[in-house]
Amino acid sequence: MTQHLTAETLRKDFLAVFGQEVDQTFFSPGRINLIGEHTDYNGGHVFPVAISLGTYGAARKRDDQVLRFYSANFEDKGIIEVPLADLKFEKEHNWTNYPKGVLHFLQEAGHVIDKGFDFYVYGNIPNGSGLSSSASLEILTGVVAEHLFDLKLERLDLVKIGKQTENNFIGVNSGIMDQFAIGMGADQRAIYLDTNTLEYDLVPLDLKDNVVVIMNTNKRRELADSKYNERRAECEKAVEELQVALDIQTLGELDEWAVDQYSYLIKDENRLKRARHAVLENQRTLKAQAALQAGDLETFGRLMNASHVSLEHDYEVTGLELDTLVHTAWAQEGVLGARMTGAGFSGCAIALVQKDTVEAFKEAVGKHYEEVVGYAPSFYIAEVAGGTRVLD
């Protein structure tokens, strides 16, 4: 599933499915978050990178008002046809709800999409892995529409439309990190993003003799059906309770002193744990960015470890599979740090590993994980990529 495609292959595949030559081909990356988990909807900082696993697209404008979607990942669904005038969420339309949502909100924003198009998609992000296949597809759709219809579309506006699609069309109360990382990514750079202001820095990702290993639990996770929305609601309630004494809008405005000082205002122990994670994770992200800028990878790794402990015990979004991967990774030679990445509840973890120990690392972690969980994990080396773009 990690096959990379060329523009030429995409053209051939498009022709085989739709019987027409393609207009243009595209690539949209996935993302991992180095640190700063569940902070994006809490007004905190995040530190993601776009990666070379992602979503490929090929498209051709039509002369009528019909959208035709085909995914090589869901061949059994065949070509799904949708009238351009009827862009509403329909469960049976499966993956096409993501592009439908983006097109709906582009039109709502005043962008003229006056014809249908044929849209071929292939993703090599493992499904349900938490590497943002949905956001990758959302930003891909926007860039396809931008080029087919010559839209005057600022990339940040498209990022916001991707989030709007996730929140108001699909029904997941996610933050803006995934779409931002995918839309604004740059080669060999991490994005240090303040989700409260959307101010960001592109930070050189110099890992020296280390690589980021992505560890996939291979346990499916459906974000919309998980406890993700529940965690967000708990944090929003904690903010309401703190507003009795504090002039704040988000947990990201607090430091660790404040969350301790005013903890008595939060009436539920679980909500206090959620709030503590959001505040301290934001502080860890500030420190991690400074450590990376200074070339201090040992400190960066320790902050990764502390992040996972907080996600495990305070935010409670890890579970057996992620904890087994991360705890086993911590015990291996050559590992500077490891943590879950993404929303949690399965999906993936990452580890910062010395290059010359990677093979031994994969063997040891994979063996122990299979003994505990009953099936094998998958491993990928995270290659940092640029944002969504035209291939040819």
Curated annotation (Swiss-Prot):
Positions of disulphide bridges: none
Top-level lineage group: Bacteria
Functional pathway: Carbohydrate metabolism; galactose metabolism
Active site: D178 (proton acceptor)
Cellular compartment(s): Cytoplasm
Positions that bind ATP: S71, G128, S129, G130, L131, S132, S133, S134
Key word Metal-binding present: yes
One cellular component (GO) term of this entry: cytosol
Keyword vocabulary terms for this entry: ATP-binding, Carbohydrate metabolism, Cytoplasm, Galactose metabolism, Kinase, Magnesium, Metal-binding, Nucleotide-binding, Transferase
Listed EC numbers: 2.7.1.6
Residues annotated for substrate binding in this entry: E37, H38, T39, D40, Y228
Marked site positions, Transition state stabilizer: R31
Chain positions recorded as Mg(2+) binding sites: S134, E166
Top EC class of this enzyme: transferase
Catalytic activity: alpha-D-galactose + ATP = alpha-D-galactose 1-phosphate + ADP + H(+)
InterPro entries found in the cross-reference section: Galactokinase, Galactokinase_bac, Galactokinase_CS, GalKase_N, GHMP_kinase_C_dom, GHMP_kinase_C_sf, GHMP_kinase_N_dom, GHMP_knse_ATP-bd_CS
GO process annotations (BP): galactose metabolic process
Single GO term (MF): ATP binding
Function: Catalyzes the transfer of the gamma-phosphate of ATP to D-galactose to form alpha-D-galactose-1-phosphate (Gal-1-P).
Record family assignment: Belongs to the GHMP kinase family. GalK subfamily.
Protein name as it appears in the record: Galactokinase
Organism whose genome encodes this protein: Streptococcus pneumoniae (strain ATCC BAA-255 / R6)
